[in-house]
C-alpha cells in the first residue's frame, strides 16, 4: 500500500494505492478550539466534524473547522504560519498529528513506503534535515510506514513528465514558497526554494471577484491582477534562474527542456498565458519543449510522491540503500 503525502502550507493531501484503486484524502491546515461542553459535543455529532480532545478542549480541524467556526461566530487558526511548523506549542503539534492521522490510514502490513513532501524552505538532505522534518517523518513512521522525503519539484516531474523520461524542470508554486527541481531520468540533479507568497495573490483575486465593485469594474480588476501576478511570477522565475546558474545547475538541463508546474495559482483562468509571459521576461537561457500545467493541481504533488513510493517499493534493497 504505497502512499504519496503532500504536506502543504494550506492543505495536507494523500494519495494511496490500495491495490484495486487510488484513494485520495485531503485536510485543510486550519483548526478551531472550543470548550468541551455538551452543547459543543452535540454540534460535532450533528455535523460529524473531525475533531480530537486536548485537555478540557475540543479541537476541530480541516474544512469542518471553518464550518463550525461560521456557526459559532469564531475564527479558525492557521496551523502553519508562514509555512513553518509551530514552535514551542505542544497543542499545535498534537493537532498536526491529528491531521496527518486523518489522511494517512495505518499501514495494514509490513512497512510500506510513504514518500512525502514538506512545506518549502526546509533542507531535505539526510545530513541537514531539521528537527521539524524529522518530526514529520516520525508522524509518518508512527502510522507504520517507511518515510522518504522528496522535493515538491521532483514530485511534479514524476507526476507530469513520464513522456519526457522523467526529465525536465519541476515547479511547485506554493502559497508561501516555490520549489524548483532539475531532474534527469528520475534523478534530481539540483533544486532551489524561492519565497513567493503566491497565496496572497490568489486571495487578492478571489477578494476582487467577490467585491461589490467586481461586476462594474471586472475588466479593470482582472487587468490589474494579471499585471501584479505576472510581475511576481517573473521575479520568482528570475530568482530561481539566478540561483541555479550560481550553482552551475543550468548547464545540466537537457534541451529542449520540459516543464511541469502546479500550485493553487495555476487554477486561475488564463494562467498558461501569464506563465509564458513571465517565463519570457525572466531570461532563462534554455530552449523549452513543452510546458505542462497540472490538470489536477490539488493532487499532482501527492501523485508524484505515490509514483516515487511505488518505484522505490519495486527497487532492490541494495538500490534503496544506495
Indicate residue ranges for each PLM-predicted region:
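Nucleotide/phosphate-binding catalytic cleft detector across ATP-hydrolyzing
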Residues: 1-25, 29-50, 63-170, 185-199, ...
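Long, charge-rich alpha-helical interaction segments
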Residues: 213-220
